């Protein structure tokens, strides 16, 4: 079971160039949360 998880933990070699993009993906929801606060501040928290 652990060997299967290790295979999925590392991207296949074909997707190696996209590795930096995959590292950034988890941050995107946080950016949307910050965007919501900036938007509400812009409209004075109506």
From Swiss-Prot:
Transmembrane regions listed in the UniProt entry: 25-45
Function text? One of the components of the core complex of photosystem II (PSII). PSII is a light-driven water:plastoquinone oxidoreductase that uses light energy to abstract electrons from H(2)O, generating O(2) and a proton gradient subsequently used for ATP formation. It consists of a core antenna complex that captures photons, and an electron transfer chain that converts photonic excitation into a charge separation.
HAMAP family associated with the record? PSII_PsbK
Q: Name one GO biological process term.
A: photosynthesis
Which keywords describe this protein according to UniProt? Chloroplast, Membrane, Photosynthesis, Photosystem II, Plastid, Reaction center, Thylakoid, Transmembrane, Transmembrane helix
Taxonomic placement:
Eukaryota, Viridiplantae, Chlorophyta, core chlorophytes, Chlorophyceae
Q: Which Gene Ontology CC terms are recorded?
A: chloroplast thylakoid membrane; photosystem II reaction center
Task: Indicate how the chain sits in the lipid bilayer.
Answer: Single-pass membrane protein
What subcellular compartments does it reside in? Plastid, Chloroplast thylakoid membrane
Highest taxon in the source lineage: Eukaryota
Tagged with keyword Flavoprotein: no
Instruction: Keyword check for Metal-binding, yes or no.
Output: no
Q: Which Pfam families match?
A: PsbK (PF02533)
Family, as annotated: Belongs to the PsbK family.
List the propeptide residues: 1-9
Q: How is the quaternary structure described?
A: PSII is composed of 1 copy each of membrane proteins PsbA, PsbB, PsbC, PsbD, PsbE, PsbF, PsbH, PsbI, PsbJ, PsbK, PsbL, PsbM, PsbT, PsbX, PsbY, PsbZ, Psb30/Ycf12, at least 3 peripheral proteins of the oxygen-evolving complex and a large number of cofactors. It forms dimeric complexes.
Question: By what name is this protein known?
Answer: Photosystem II reaction center protein K
- InterPro entries per record: PSII_PsbK (IPR003687), PSII_PsbK_sf (IPR037270)
């Amino acid at each position: 079971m652990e060997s299967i998880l290790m295979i999925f933990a590392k991207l296949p070699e074909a997707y190696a160039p996209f590795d930096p993009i995959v590292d950034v993906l988890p941050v995107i929801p946080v950016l949307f949360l910050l965007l919501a606060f900036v938007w509400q501040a812009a409209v004075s928290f109506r």
